[in-house]
Structure formats: C-alpha cells, structure tokens
A protein has these predicted regions:
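Bacterial N-terminal signal peptides
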Residues: 1-6
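Boundary/junction segments of secreted and surface-exposed precursor proteins
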Residues: 8-37, 92, 179-208
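A short beta-strand-loop element at or near the start of a globular domain
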Residues: 19-64
Length: 208
C-alpha cells in the first residue's frame, strides 16, 4: 500500500513525560531564595516522544506561585547519544552546540494556576527520536515563580542541577552540577514532518 500525504496535513500530537509525585522548586521558583539556576533534563527515546517538529514545550505548575522576572534566561534543546547525564554540564553537549528555543532578559513568568504553562518553539525544533537534552539557565530574579511537578525516575542520572541560593553556591554553579534522578512532568507538542507533495505521474514512474 502506497500512501501519499499532502504537506502540512498531519495534526499535532502531545506527548507527556515524567509524573506528579513530587513538588519540585526547580527550575522556576525564585521565591525559595534561588538567585541563579542551571538545570539539565534528559528525555530518552523510551519516554515515548515521537519524531517530528517540536512546536511547544510545557511544564505542569503545582499552583500557588507569584509573578516573577528571570534575568539572562534561556532554554536550550540538543539531541544527544546518551541514556544518562554526566558531570560537568558541558560534557552532556557531546561537542555540539545546543539550540536556544526560548530566551528573555528578563523573562516574565506570570503566576500560573495549577496546570500546564510553557513556550511556543519558533522556529520549530526538528526532533529525530534520539535522546533530547533540555537545559534551563538563568541568573538573577525578582523572587517570584512557581513550583512544578516531577517524579523520581527509575533510571538514574536524568537531571543535573546547580544554583546559587541565598548567595551560597550549591553544586558548583554554573559549571559543575550534581546528578539527580528527577524526571519533570513535561508536555511536548509535535507535528510530524510534512511529506512534500508528489505528482501521481512521478510516483508511477518511480514504481515501474
């Protein structure tokens, strides 16, 4: 059976990873005395996010936050060939350069009610199904923000985290970090990569 898809015809699909067993301050909760944060999360193929164009990335707030401004804020994506994270942070780049999918100086975060909040990815990020490194990095805030849900992953080394808390360096910010097994509750919106329109005559010629 030969299926011919029109470009742009496929619908977007959402994929959820992680869980809601833990209320976690990282990485958007300046109210806890956090002055700077660097945070990495690894999403592996078995988490089930399909290949395609990533168009939106979201977190699930536990509610009860306050509006916050985050300085020198950026979110980065990078596909890598690993099943767990190592130290220091930059070793997880595998000699590649991550793609900035969101940034702001400041980035203004409203106080979301319990539920999803996040970022549209423009242009979209082409995801080919390998492990996806997600990184959040900011330095300076207005003591606002929100807590988010996560769970402890069955596989270790899924998260690397460092911060400055109440002027004290924790876990060797910004370069070293400490490994955790947190897997944050996140949602990815994926649009399958469109197939270019092909004339029926061209298809017949290819299959003679």
């Amino acid at each position: 059976v030969l299926a011919i898809l029109a470009a742009g015809a496929a619908a977007e699909t959402t994929f959820i990873v992680g869980g809601k067993s833990i209320v976690n301050e990282t990485p958007f909760f300046g109210r806890s005395g956090l002055d700077a944060v660097r945070w990495q999360q690894l999403v592996v193929p078995s988490d089930g996010v399909a290949e395609g164009d990533l168009r939106r990335w979201e977190w699930h707030s536990s509610g009860g936050g306050t509006p916050g401004d985050f300085q020198q804020f950026k979110v980065q994506f990078l596909e890598v060939d690993r099943s767990g994270l190592t130290l220091p942070f930059n070793s997880n780049y595998e000699n590649q350069t991550p793609v900035v999918i969101a940034s702001g100086d400041p980035f203004v975060l409203d106080a979301p009610d319990a539920g999803w909040f996040g970022f549209d990815i423009t242009p979209s990020f082409n995801y080919t199904g390998r492990s996806l490194l997600v990184e959040v990095w900011w330095s300076g805030d207005s003591e606002g923000g929100t807590q988010c849900y996560s769970k402890n992953a069955t596989r270790e080394s899924r998260c690397v985290y460092a911060c400055i808390r109440n002027s004290v360096n924790v876990n060797g910010y910004p370069n070293q970090g400490k490994i955790y097994n947190w897997l944050h509750y996140m949602r990815f919106t994926v649009s399958p990569i469109a197939v270019e329109p092909t004339s029926l005559g061209r298809v017949r010629a290819l299959y003679r």
